[in-house]
């Protein structure tokens, strides 16, 4: 079924509003939980490449008629980023704690990428105080569930465990690939896959935890809240 483009023009116009009008439109027309989940995930993996492109904007026209953002193209994540100073995407630089590019609000007008772009929809979400608070609370939940704090024992780290699983699964193919094609001829040409995995763990995951939990946590900038205690509910007792 063919649909026109009136709704996308409506969205583009609506997110230019301010204050109560903007808040009302976002709550009425956006799938708030889905968008917040999407944004929190991009912060954990430090995705700078989804700001001006590399995402789908989907409207459930036959259902709740709400918009949400869907991910696409995640090669420049987990520390990888476009480097305008040289090399483009072919560089070994790890982006993990350099603000504004590594800030939790990257993508709004005050936290642009190193390609000097920002996203008006993301900016609209963060300009509404209630939605911003919801985002930061959800970000903390995702951090605790997936990234985990810097104090987490190494044996309990989920990201690192998953990386190790993938290395074990892919190693035979990786060895064949490197034997045939060698190591890419940019950056550190001596870096093999094992070294790259070690860098991912020590230079991205470890430092990302510090940046989000400490630099921007309650004891740092105060932006990201502390974890909330789950209330104890006893059913069947009064």
Region locations from a protein language model:
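Middle-to-C-terminal accessory/interaction subdomains
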Residues: 1-52, 58-238
């Amino acid at each position: 079924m063919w649909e026109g483009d009136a709704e996308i023009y409506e969205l583009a116009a609506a997110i230019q509003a301010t204050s109560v009008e903007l808040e009302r439109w976002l709550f009425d027309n956006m799938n708030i939980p889905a968008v917040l989940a999407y944004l929190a995930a991009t912060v954990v993996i430090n995705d700078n490449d989804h700001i001006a492109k590399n995402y789908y904007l989907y409207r459930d026209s036959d259902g709740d008629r709400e918009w949400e953002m869907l991910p696409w193209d995640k090669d420049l994540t987990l520390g990888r980023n476009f480097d305008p100073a040289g090399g483009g995407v072919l560089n070994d630089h790890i982006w993990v704690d350099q603000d504004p590019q590594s800030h939790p609000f990257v993508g709004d007008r005050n936290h642009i990428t190193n390609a000097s772009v920002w996203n008006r929809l993301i900016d609209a979400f963060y300009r509404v105080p209630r939605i911003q608070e919801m985002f930061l609370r959800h970000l903390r939940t995702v951090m605790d569930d997936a990234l985990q704090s810097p104090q987490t024992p190494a044996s309990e780290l989920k990201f690192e465990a998953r990386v190790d699983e993938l290395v074990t699964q892919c190693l035979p193919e990786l060895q064949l690939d490197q034997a045939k094609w060698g190591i890419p001829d940019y950056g550190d040409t001596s870096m093999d896959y094992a070294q790259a995995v070690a860098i991912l763990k020590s230079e991205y995951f470890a430092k990302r935890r510090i940046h989000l939990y400490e630099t921007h946590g309650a004891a740092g900038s105060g932006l990201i809240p502390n974890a909330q205690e789950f209330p104890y509910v006893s059913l069947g007792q009064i």
